[in-house]
Amino acid sequence: MENRKTFSWLKEQMIRSISVSIMIYVITRTSISNAYPIFAQQGYENPREATGRIVCANCHLANKPVDIEVPQAVLPDTVFEAVLRIPYDMQLKQVLANGKKGGLNVGAVLILPEGFELAPPDRISPELKEKIGNLSFQSYRPNKKNILVIGPVPGKKYSEIVFPILSPDPATKKDVHFLKYPIYVGGNRGRGQIYPDGTKSNNTVYNATSTGIVKKILRKEKGGYEISIVDASDGRQVIDIIPPGPELLVSEGESIKLDQPLTSNPNVGGFGQGDAEIVLQDPLRVQGLLFFFASVILAQVFLVLKKKQFEKVQLYEMNF
């Protein structure tokens, strides 16, 4: 009887432990997914400022090119591709958060016209799914389905990102019209230089915060440096903290000036933005255009036939 009670108690404790583990996993997984993927989502209601500048440029300071390719025109309720290319030298290595070197990651934000959105999985063809790969897109905000974000993802595999887009149908969405619309895109390769709170990352250059002489350079156990700068005029001492990653450019006893670079700039990445235009085409206009072309061709055919008939009549009259 006592053994049975002990077994029952052990069974109950095991069930509780498993339940707690599952709850912790779910909570942790949810918090991670909510924080992923782009810092801009946390601090900006709209990723494109009134000036046209995409806010990712606030953290990624270097300017690099991107290329966006979309169809010239699409029909309503149609799935099409928006292809973003983020070119860079695949041999480059970036400074990671721990100071070590690693491959570059890429990320992007695609700002579509109102009404355009990510195509649902059941509307994406197998060929398009193969082009997309294992990428997972998400809306910038739940109420902004026309703004899509992706990343960070490995740059070597996804320097070309294919977005599956569904065009709107003005027949069901009265605020959408058959017009030419702009599309805006921003893409980065590599880590940023500034965090959203304004602090520097270890992927940027560090400058002296005071004029003076480098009295001491202390190499920290986990990487990085503490640089003691003494002002010769008043003896005031300032300590500049350098995180692991950037290479030191100064040495002890060296005289330096305010804002003089203490380290190299390890950044090899950068951010770029571009735009394109797309026409939401009315099917009736296309049909009308095809009818017009057919009419012109038929008119040309009848004109040729009439000319040949006239020539035959002239030849007959001359022979008569």
Swiss-Prot record:
Species this chain originates from: Saccharum officinarum
Cofactor: heme
Protein's recorded name: Cytochrome f
Family from the record: Belongs to the cytochrome f family.
Designated gene of the protein: petA
Compartment annotation: Plastid, Chloroplast thylakoid membrane
GO molecular function, one term: iron ion binding
Binding site for heme: 36, 56, 59-60
Organism classification: Eukaryota, Viridiplantae, Streptophyta, Embryophyta, Tracheophyta
Membrane topology type: Single-pass membrane protein
